[in-house]
Amino acid sequence: MIGKLSLLLVCVAVASGNPAAGKPWHWKSPKPLVDPRIHVNATPRIVGGVEATPHSWPHQAALFIDDMYFCGGSLISSEWVLTAAHCMDGAGFVEVVLGAHNIRQNEASQVSITSTDFFTHENWNSWLLTNDIALIKLPSPVSLNSNIKTVKLPSSDVAVGTTVTPTGWGRPLDSAGGISDVLRQVDVPIMTNDDCDAVYGIVGNGVVCIDSEGGKGTCNGDSGGPLNLNGMTYGITSFGSSAGCEVGYPDAFTRVYYYLDWIEQKTGVTP
């Protein structure tokens, strides 16, 4: 059971050639945070990893939600973006920015698309954080190019111990004033669900966790973004520890493989 669930709303200023251009908006991260049930001995860490090579993750989407919230997403077809339910729950509209690396700059590669057609999983539970998955339908197919590509869905599950790579514009440090200007990535191993559940108590079959004990992980602003491996997305950034991003507690992702039937039913997209 959850001792306490809090939504950390971190205000961050963004000014770029995408939806934030010329507007004094203050973006908030809706990433859910859960109180750990056990103590993890870990030293403070830089959570953001390293800056990604520009456009090396061309399926990565930046989501500007209701002029207020920021999340990530994955382009799984020319018309569909995969993200987290906690990002889209109660939203009115979303600006989907594709082809971006630096979200504070007006990059020629960026394409911005407004959508009001999206939905969360029918059994999304914001208290237990189950079924944390959502889909965004673009109003028309986006043109694919070297900077904007789709990512494949996995045809098999990811094994414990496998090194995977989450990506996003989330905060690189707990002390950071806002999200990262540039897309970042970090390599981390998959851990067992039993070990992850020992920390949070809410980890079911639809969740996959990464071991952050080595000093790496995701943070606020990474919500909804992909967990990458071999050209496929195995997870959707879901929740982390209320103790902070730098203390070494596991990070949890929605397990994409578990939801393949649901994704196919809604979009027709298959592995």
From Swiss-Prot:
Active-site feature positions: H86 (charge relay system), D132 (charge relay system), S223 (charge relay system)
Pfam entry (one): Trypsin
Listed SMART domains: Tryp_SPc (SM00020)
Native organism: Penaeus vannamei (Whiteleg shrimp)
Family designation: Belongs to the peptidase S1 family.
Gene Ontology biological process terms, A to Z: collagen catabolic process; proteolysis
One term under GO cellular component: extracellular region
Predominant cellular place of this UniProt entry's protein: secreted
Keyword presence, Secreted: yes
Gene3D superfamilies membership: Trypsin-like serine proteases
Region forming the signal peptide: 1-15
Name of the protein in its database record: Chymotrypsin BII
